[in-house]
UniProtKB/Swiss-Prot annotation:
Belongs to the ATG16 family. This is Autophagy-related protein 16. It is found in: Preautophagosomal structure membrane. The gene is ATG16. It is a peripheral membrane protein. One of its GO terms (cellular component) is phagophore assembly site membrane. Residues 76-113 form a coiled coil. It comes from Kluyveromyces marxianus (strain DMKU3-1042 / BCC 29191 / NBRC 104275). Kluyveromyces marxianus proteins are shorter in length and have a more ordered secondary structure than their S.cerevisiae counterparts, which might contribute to the superior thermotolerance and solubility. K.marxianus could be therefore useful as a new model organism for further elucidation of the molecular details of autophagy. Pfam families: ATG16 (PF08614). Disulfide bonds: none annotated. Gene3D superfamilies: 1.20.5.170.
Length: 126
């Protein structure tokens, strides 16, 4: 019960963290040191801040796309390896079944031969 409660609290905290990251505020206007700065400076600063923020996000998107490509490539490689291992396992299973059948036939032949020899020896003693 306590474990489930802790897990739900952790999940809630993770969701809350992701939500806050989604809606973090971009500082449009830097804090003005002088009260008399004009409207043009404020707009230019806002535009510069937005461009910087956009550049950071574009770089982050580019990095995440690279990571995604790498993970997709690794996943594809892993799937190929799993497929080849599965095929190899199937082939080995078939070979095992054939060898098991051959072994069973050899044992049966050997038992028949041993039975014939025993019958022959018994008939000589009678």
């Amino acid at each position: 019960m306590e474990y489930e409660l802790l897990e739900s609290i952790r999940a809630r905290d993770l969701v809350d963290k992701r939500f806050s990251q989604l809606f973090e505020e971009v500082p449009l206007v830097p804090k003005l040191e002088k009260a008399g700065e004009g409207d043009t400076n404020v707009k230019e600063s806002s535009i510069k801040n937005l461009k910087d923020y956009l550049k950071l996000r574009d770089e982050e998107v580019y990095k995440l796309k690279d990571i995604l490509k790498l993970k997709n490539r690794d996943t594809e490689r892993l799937n190929d390896e799993l497929l080849s291992a599965n095929i190899e396992s199937n082939l080995l299973q078939e070979r095992l079944e054939k060898l098991q059948q051959e072994y069973d036939r050899l044992i049966e032949r050997w038992l028949l031969k041993a039975q014939k020899e025993a019958d022959t020896m018994n008939s000589h003693f009678k």
